[in-house]
Amino acid sequence: MATKGVVKGIVSNLVTVEVDGPVSQNEICYIDVNGTKLMSEVIKVIGKNAYVQVFESTRGMHVGDEAEFVGSMLEVTLGPGMLSKNYDGLQHDLDKMDGVFLKRGDYTAALDDDKLWDFKPLAKVGDNVIAGSWLGEVTENFQPHRIMVPFVFEGGYKVKSVAQAGQYKVNDVIAVVTDADGKDHNVTMVQKWPVKRAIPCYREKPRPFKLLETGIRIIDTFNPIVEGGTGFIPGPFGTGKTVLQHAISKQAEADIVIIAACGERANEVVEIFAEFPHLNDPHTGRKLMERTIIIANTSNMPVASREASVYTAMTIAEYYRSMGLRVLMMADSTSRWAQALREMSNRLEELPGPDAFPMDLSAIVANFYARAGFVYLNNGATGSVTFIGTVSPAGGNLKEPVTESTKKVARCFYALEQNRADRKRYPAVNPIDSYSKYLEYPEFESYISNHIASDWITKVNDLKMRLHQGKEIAEQINILGDDGVPVNYHVTFWKAELIDFVILQQDAFDSVDCNSSLERQELMLSKVSDICRTEFDFEDFLEVSDYFKLVINIFKQVNYSEFKSADYDKYNKELDAILAERIK
């Protein structure tokens, strides 16, 4: 029999319920408020009192209102039909909801129960299967969507029957499997999984090593991220976080893109809803939305649903990874998620940590980031979840707790800087403060050596050192003036500017420059490295600046020309001729 309870206290979204039976941490309950059932989650249990966070506004709730516990955790519904959907943090389909504001207690189904899917069996009668094994597949927006043995099944099973190829609804039985005790279990296209638990259906989770190509030079060349890697983008307001995220999600070599807009301002979420359906996928020529899922929670939505949205997004990402697909998940912004954790922690009167965030903030962030990764599935296929979160530190302060906690666990750090944004040097990623720990991985080094160039990482480290030198000399020039430093200092400074203007800066709104292939980046890196290693002969600092401005200008024309086109070759020859004039 389901456990019931009575409301004893209300503090905004935190409600104390006195229960008449057993309840567990993270269990879902529904509180009846004037006939409307409000979804809630247990976050703490002390004696007979369960503290629950309500996913809706608690206006109109009274002491004495009844609550009913469902006996399960917050779960997502997993099955075909999720691609192209717009969900809220609890996986309710926003497109099915009417009105400007969402009605309280209005919950919609995540999947379309009536749609017919073309099913094709992959398993045969008599096959031995375990949780996560592929039984068949349907085509969802041109992607193969594998129908798997439910993740909750434990131990080994034998396939008793599989449906023939044909059209079926998501709730139709497509297979029957028999467990070790001889008991039969029906399998449909749909399964449920609790969002707070990672899906464990894989054989091995090695260190990721395969470069994830994004087409953004400051990422791919200077601070690469890998398939199954983690990264984060901190930056103050107006530094281009959202544009950079859009560019990554549009251009990255991923099969599925999941965007969790957890607590962003309403106008930014509207921008995502308005823009994404019109974006073209450069890989397939189709609409990007066909392989995208958007999970949106604005800042004015209740705190609890903001927290749930990132877990919902990650669980869906893990589900697609279990099909052997490459998934890219973007969260914008994890700061709002951390603020939601802070709010509930404060209401529970827990011991506060720095800036009143929970004491265990680092552990919560680390556990979440650990769910990303590259895996070998039980059938030998590979899948990955690459996670990139943005952080919006108050006042651009990169020493605040959320940034510090994320820095400990994310392997890539792309620091957006107000100073670079003010000078219109986009993407405004600071090349000196940013880093990628993957450059230190031996597996990644050997992958780069075998697939791109053996001296790639050496050249990148050399250019990074030159950027450091350029920054130091720029400070000296600012203090002493142009005449106060030797000419060779000016040459070093302008070589750093060349790296910045040619490789680091990129036009996200130009159809050619927005996306650089790895082959193109390799040629650019070699060319810029050669220029930086060349000794030039100049009389004074004016000659240096005039010459390098000319080189940068021609290089910009190369960047705006289609790769290996007539214009591209023409500007490259022009560049070679100008460089030959000045070599010592």
Give the label of every model feature segment.
Residues 54, 59, 119-128, 158-167:
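Short histidine-centered loop motifs in beta-beta connectors
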Residues 20, 34, 72-73, 91, ...:
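Short, surface-exposed secondary-structure boundary micro-motifs
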Residues 221-222, 228-552, 556, 564:
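P-loop NTPase catalytic core
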Residues 99-133, 137-140, 145-152, 169-229, ...:
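P-loop NTPase nucleotide-binding/switch module
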Residues 546-583:
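Long, highly charged low-complexity segments enriched in Glu/Asp and Lys/Arg with interspersed Ser/Thr
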Residues 1-103:
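N-terminal accessory targeting/assembly segments
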Residues 74-78, 93-99, 182-185, 205, ...:
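Active-site phosphate-binding and catalytic loops of NTP-dependent enzymes
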Residues 43-49, 80-91, 143-166, 184-199:
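Short, compositionally biased
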